Design a protein with these regions (language model features):
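A short beta-sheet element
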Residues: 70-74, 80-159
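Non-catalytic DNA-recognition/assembly elements of restriction-modification systems
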Residues: 15-53, 58-70, 168-213
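Juxtamembrane/interface motifs at transmembrane-helix termini
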Residues: 59-60, 75, 98, 151-154, ...
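Extended, domain-scale alpha-helical bundle/helix-rich regions
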Residues: 2-4, 9
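Proline-centric
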Residues: 30-33, 118-126, 141-143, 153-184
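Short, compositionally biased low-complexity segments
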Residues: 11-19, 105-108
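Sequence-level motif detector for i,i+2 pairs with an aromatic at +2
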Residues: 1, 35-38, 63-66, 85, ...
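A generic local secondary-structure boundary/capping motif
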Residues: 57, 78-79
Length: 213
């Protein structure tokens, strides 16, 4: 999809089959003819005001099975949640980008707690979380991040990120295909969480001899 080889009207890869591409000055790249651009702030709702950070001491008092997310991943598990739904997280400060200069993204679903080091984005206007991840994964954030030692992507700059605007009829088709992939990936993520929790519970008992193999 990000290489614009989605199925054309004949079911063939659009770009590879000679689909017309036009240069877009805002994106500084070619996009399919008929596509436009839109800002991230126009296709998402940012829920940053709902985030609540917990110190390590605070988290010790509320241990549970609900993931507690930071900028780059799950930091802990707690017994309560702030968010219950489907969201995309974008790292706000600390480690905010990959070695390629693209944003650090996480896809979360269900009950979760997110601290103040990751932006919480809910896609709107017929965009899905999976589609949003794909639109953002190759975007450079080099010019919008601030700071050199303690890097940060503030909400204002994040909302100005431009991404390709997909025609509505194609948007529905793409979302249908991505939904199947998204469900499979979420199932794998959930299985991995359960295995991680099992490991963290079992390993100390193996180390002190409570359990033998």
């Amino acid at each position: 999809f990000v290489q614009f080889d989605f199925p054309d009207q004949n079911g063939k890869p659009y770009k590879s089959s000679g689909g017309k591409m036009v240069c877009n000055p805002e994106l500084k790249r070619e996009i399919p003819e008929g596509w436009g651009v839109e800002k991230l702030g126009d296709i998402t709702i940012c829920h940053d005001s709902k985030r609540v950070p917990l110190s390590s001491n605070d988290r010790e008092l509320v241990k549970g099975k609900i993931p507690y997310y930071g900028a780059t991943g799950i930091m802990d598990y707690v017994n309560d949640y702030i968010f219950d739904g489907d969201y995309v997280l974008m790292a706000e400060d600390g480690s905010v980008m990959t070695e390629k200069g693209t944003p650090i993204l996480q896809r979360i679903s269900g009950k979760n707690w997110v601290n103040n080091h990751a932006h919480v984005l809910e896609p709107v206007k017929n965009h899905s979380c999976k589609l949003l991840m794909m639109l953002l994964k190759d975007v450079s954030v080099m010019k919008i991040k601030t700071g050199s030692i303690q890097m940060k992507i503030n909400q204002e700059n994040m909302n100005k990120i431009v991404v390709p605007a997909i025609p509505l009829e194609l948007l529905f088709e793409i979302n249908q295909k991505l939904e199947v992939i998204d469900k499979q990936q979420l199932n794998l993520i959930e299985e991995n969480k359960q295995l991680t929790q099992l490991r963290d519970w079992l390993l100390p008992m193996l180390m002190n001899g409570q359990v033998k193999v």
